Regions:
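Compositionally biased intrinsically disordered regions enriched in Thr/Gly
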Residues: 1-79
Length: 79
């Protein structure tokens, strides 16, 4: 499903972010991002769709609201 593809894409994005900034997401973020995913938590920009999570859903409060830009030209089913 498209939700599964988006969640996999977000998981890869988080893994990349953790390389640069370890500890900015909870250790069990793969499970949390699936449990806390709400398809209505998004907004559109000229560049693409921004999917966001609430504070403390997948990361410490100090990390703020995690946002993930999914560019319009991205093919998440290949992630």
């Amino acid at each position: 499903s498209y939700i599964h593809d988006i969640q996999n894409w977000i998981q890869l994005e988080i893994a990349e972010r953790l390389k640069a900034n370890p500890g900015t997401y909870f250790d069990n973020y793969p499970q949390l991002l699936r449990n806390s995913f709400h398809p209505e938590n998004f907004y559109m920009t000229p560049e693409g769709i921004v999917i966001y999570y609430q504070q403390y859903d997948i990361a410490p409060y100090s990390s703020g609201i995690p946002e993930f830009l999914l560019p319009f030209d991205a093919n998440v089913s290949e992630s």
